[in-house]
UniProtKB/Swiss-Prot annotation:
The chain crosses the membrane at residues 11-31. It comes from Nitratidesulfovibrio vulgaris (strain ATCC 29579 / DSM 644 / CCUG 34227 / NCIMB 8303 / VKM B-1760 / Hildenborough). Residues 209-261 form the HAMP domain. Gene3D superfamilies: 3.30.450.290, 6.10.340.10, Methyl-accepting chemotaxis protein (1.10.287.950), PAS domain (3.30.450.20). The lineage of its organism: Bacteria, Pseudomonadati, Thermodesulfobacteriota, Desulfovibrionia, Desulfovibrionales. This is Chemoreceptor protein A.
């Protein structure tokens, strides 16, 4: 209200001062103009009177008629009681006057007015005319002083020695006129004061009703807004500047209210605990997440000191006062204990709020509840321990895999050597079979020519017996070698079975490694960023396990091919051995026949045909055996090649296991 009264007083003082100043100027100018008008009238009257007087006395004076001149002055005295006329000589002595008492006296002694005397003395020296208002004996007179020059027509009386013969001084009593002038001035001043008061009153009433009262209402509404009440309304009647000001203020308040509601909505929409304080560290806003921490309704803390709010939770540090005082951002960690004993680990960040001049007028405190982070840190630590345990298990598996791979490499080396030996034996069998085939062919050729050489039957029969004995012996050797080859192939099949069991162990290890890698990847995914490095390790372990499984499958396929080839070779060798045994039996029969050739010459032809037929069958069987042995040799070489490939794959598995172990060691570090 003091501001409103001050505004009204200022407006009234301004209006009154301006009006008073204007009316004073008008009053002074009016008085001056009235005085000047009055003086102008008096001056023109005095000039006319002096000219009339001069005209009246000019004739008698020019004739030297002293009596006539005196009569003229007497007539003026009788006719114009308010006029005093004096004529002096060049010494200032009064020679003629409307008053007989002052004749022959100096004008300076009669007229007690220093200002007039100065003009009078000047008029005695030079030809001049002066008018002046003067006060003589308390009365106002308008004085007209005129020099009387020594004109030629005056020389006959006064001579030529004095240029100025004297002066005519006429004093007109203007006291009534001046009194009337003052009365008019007083009336003018009175009217001016009345008009001033009326104007000030009307302006005051108008200003109070049309301006001050509306400004006071605006100030009152502004005061409510200052107190935080933005629900007020402004008047909008009229179309003047104050109405537009009301409309602008209403629009501004609406904008501020909407902006404040928007800001409050933004603050309420923030999900982290937050508080806003003013320059005196009082809480202006606190959101629901912050109230959830203290387990109290938010409205209970509005307007309270923020430091007291924090101290009730055991926080001695005044985190906002420091920012309000220094104007710098501040952050740190605190622990807040709620009334129910729950302790919240909190991280705070406080920033100053500044006005448009850069002065700190508040602060905003953002509180981050670290409870979940602490719980996550604890879970991460547990997961880290679990991951280390899994890493130990993976290390054990890798070491086991390395040992198994080393053993498998050793076994594959032995298998490769056995396959090499089998290939060598098969080569020897093939050579023997080729020799046997040549022998059987020769037997068939000899049997064919036996019929033509019947006459040599006894000798040839003896030779045939010997050859048949050799054939039986060679056939027995072929059978023995075939049986040895079959045994070697059986041993190769058994060792292939052993390799299959080792591959199964490797498959089980690879499956277990893949499962452990999958579990480790799951645990690492649960651990989030902390387990990302181990997730990479687990992925590498899983890839190594997959490569191991692929390699073992290739080895299994190679072993299966070896086993199949070995079984086929065993079957062929069994058939070959049986055929060789049949051949050996037939060769023995042939020997018996040849033994009885001498006694049974008549049946030589038939026996020779039988021998030829048997020889042809033996040649055919020998060719089949030769082909089978060649096939066995090819299979053995294939087995040897696959064994080498399996050894390379197993060595790769061993390298992968060592790499897995190195990765796990790196993860531990």
């Amino acid at each position: 209200m003091s501001t409103q009264r001050s505004l009204g007083t200022k407006v009234m003082l301004l209006v009154s001062g301006i009006s008073l100043f204007v009316y004073l100027i008008l009053a002074v100018l009016t008085s001056y103009w009235q005085r000047q008008s009055a003086l102008t009238l008096i001056d023109s009257g005095a000039v006319r009177a002096s000219e009339l007087l001069l005209d009246a006395i000019a004739d008698p004076m020019s004739k030297g008629n002293d009596t006539g001149t005196t009569e003229k002055f007497d007539a003026i005295a009788r006719r114009y009681a308010d006029i005093r006329a004096y004529m002096t000589d060049f010494r200032g002595n009064i020679t003629y006057s409307t008053s007989k008492d002052v004749l022959r006296r100096d004008l300076a002694d009669v007229v007690q007015a220093p200002a007039l005397l100065d003009k009078f003395n000047a008029a005695l020296k030079t030809d001049s005319r002066e008018e002046q208002l003067a006060t003589i004996d308390g009365m106002a007179f308008y004085a007209t002083i005129r020099s009387i020059p020594n004109a030629p027509e005056c020389h006959h009386c006064h001579g030529r020695s004095q240029p100025i013969l004297g002066t005519l001084v006429m004093l007109q009593d203007v006291t009534p006129a001046m009194s009337e002038l003052r009365l008019h001035q007083y009336e003018t001043v009175g009217l001016s004061v009345g008009g001033l008061l009326l104007l000030v009153g009307v302006l005051s009433l108008f200003m109070r009703r049309a301006v001050i009262s509306r400004v006071q209402r605006i100030a009152a509404v502004s005061g409510q807004i200052e107190q935080g009440d933005y629900s007020v309304s402004f008047e909008h009647d009229g179309n003047d500047e104050l109405t537009r000001l009301n409309a602008n203020l209403a629009s501004m308040v609406t904008t501020i209210r909407d902006q404040m509601q928007y800001n409050r909505s933004v603050l309420e929409g923030i999900i982290v605990p937050l508080a806003v304080v003013d320059a005196r560290n009082r809480i202006e806003f606190i959101n629901q997440p912050m109230c959830t921490i203290v387990s109290t309704a938010c409205h209970e803390y509005s307007g309270k000191d923020f430091s007291a709010f924090m101290q009730q939770g055991g926080v001695e540090e005044d985190i906002t006062a420091t920012v309000l005082k220094g104007g710098n951002n501040q952050q740190g960690n605190i622990s807040y204990r709620r009334d129910d004993g729950t302790v919240f680990p909190l991280h705070y960040e406080v920033s100053p709020l500044r006005d448009d001049r850069g002065a700190v007028n508040g602060a905003i405190a953002v509180i981050i509840d670290l409870t979940q982070e602490e719980e996550a840190r604890r879970r991460i630590e547990e997961q880290r321990i679990n991951l280390l345990r899994v890493a130990d298990e993976v290390t054990g598996v890798a070491e086991t895999l390395v040992r198994a791979a080393e053993a498998l490499v050793t076994r594959m080396g032995e298998l490769e050597r056995d396959a090499t030996e089998a290939a060598s034996e098969t080569t020897q069998v093939a050579t023997a079979m080729e020799e046997m085939n040549v022998t059987v062919t020769e037997v068939a050729r000899n049997a064919s020519s036996t019929a033509e050489m019947a006459d040599l039957a006894n000798g040839e029969a003896q030779s045939g017996g010997t050859e048949m004995a050799n054939t039986v012996r060679e056939t027995r050797q072929v059978a023995q070698r075939t049986e040895d080859l079959a045994e070697s192939l059986h041993e190769l099949a058994r060792r292939a079975d052993n390799i299959g069991r080792v591959i199964e162990v490797i498959n089980e290890i690879a499956d277990q490694t893949n499962l452990l890698a999958l579990n480790a990847a799951i645990e690492a995914a649960r651990a989030g960023d902390a387990g990302r490095g181990f997730a990479v390790v687990a992925d590498e372990v899983r890839k190594l396990a997959e490569k191991t499984m692929v390699a073992t499958r290739e080895v299994e396929q190679a072993i299966a091919a070896i086993q199949q080839g070995s079984n086929d070779a065993v079957e062929v060798m069994t058939e070959t051995r049986q055929q060789v045994e049949v051949t050996a039996g037939k060769a023995e029969d042939t020997g018996k026949v040849l033994s009885g050739i001498v006694g049974r010459a008549e049946s030589i032809a038939d026996m020779v045909r039988n021998i030829a037929t048997a020889s042809e069958q033996q040649s055919s069987t020998s060719d089949e055996i030769n082909r089978n042995v060649t096939r066995i040799n090819d299979l053995t070489e294939g087995i040897q090649r696959r064994v080498r490939e399996a050894g390379d794959a197993i060595r790769q598995v061993e390298g992968m296991a060592q790499r897995l172990e190195a990765l796990v060691d790196g993860f531990r570090k």
